[in-house]
């Protein structure tokens, strides 16, 4: 969600001798997009995951916005990444000087229980399935727009295009809370 959602394409194209573009990434199951088996994708990912996740580019304005948000909010990163990527994830956040109150590397896409334990008010997500699951548990979700998450939304999900829009929505929510 803080990184470019298509960061993996160049590596996958090189490895599988393909020519996939970001426009073709219309679903979250990457092996289907590439036209390979899940096992083939898993083998590829396991070979390069540390390199891939250490070099993924950060989204425009994400660092600055998170730094501003941390002044009035707790910032938790809840990621579905595998546990073996926990140290790398901390290093990545520190490299970009991204402040946080906690990092939760779940090794699973199911984030609801952790979000409940942390009493999250807003969840920023790019996975459609995660957004739906979180929203059904009454979390407000800001779904960062990607080619692979453009499906119908419910009342607890707001589609956002960038980190400035995320900031504006959260700031508006904070002002409404203060007014009450």
Where do the model's predicted regions map?
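Short, acidic loop-to-helix structural element flanking the phosphoryl-transfer center
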Residues: 50-77, 82-90
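Substrate-recognition "cap/lid" segment bordering the active-site pocket of phosphatases
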Residues: 80-133, 137
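Short, charged, surface-exposed secondary-structure boundary motifs
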Residues: 112-115, 151-158, 169-171
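Short glycine/proline- and acidic residue-enriched helix-loop micro-motifs
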Residues: 43-51
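Short acidic-hydrophobic, aromatic-tinged amphipathic segments that line or gate anion-handling sites
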Residues: 103-107, 158-165
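Acidic, Mg2+-coordinating phosphoryl-transfer loop and its flanking beta/alpha structural elements
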Residues: 120-161
């Amino acid at each position: 969600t803080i990184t470019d959602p298509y960061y993996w394409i160049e590596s996958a194209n090189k490895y599988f001798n393909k020519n996939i573009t970001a426009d073709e990434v219309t679903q979250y199951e990457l092996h289907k997009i590439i036209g390979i088996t899940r096992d083939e994708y898993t083998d590829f990912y396991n070979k390069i995951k540390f390199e891939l996740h250490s070099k993924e580019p950060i989204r425009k304005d994400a660092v600055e916005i998170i730094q501003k948000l941390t002044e009035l909010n707790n910032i938790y990163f809840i990621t579905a990444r595998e546990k073996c990527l926990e140290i790398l994830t901390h290093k990545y956040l520190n490299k970009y000087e991204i402040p946080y109150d906690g990092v939760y590397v779940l090794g699973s896409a199911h984030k609801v229980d952790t979000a409940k334990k942390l009493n999250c008010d807003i969840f920023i997500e790019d996975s459609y399935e995660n957004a739906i699951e979180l929203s059904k548990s009454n979390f407000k979700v800001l779904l960062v727009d990607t080619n692979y998450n453009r499906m119908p939304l419910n009342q607890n999900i707001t589609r956002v295009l960038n980190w400035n829009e995320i900031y504006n929505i959260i700031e508006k929510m904070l002002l409404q809370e203060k007014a009450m």
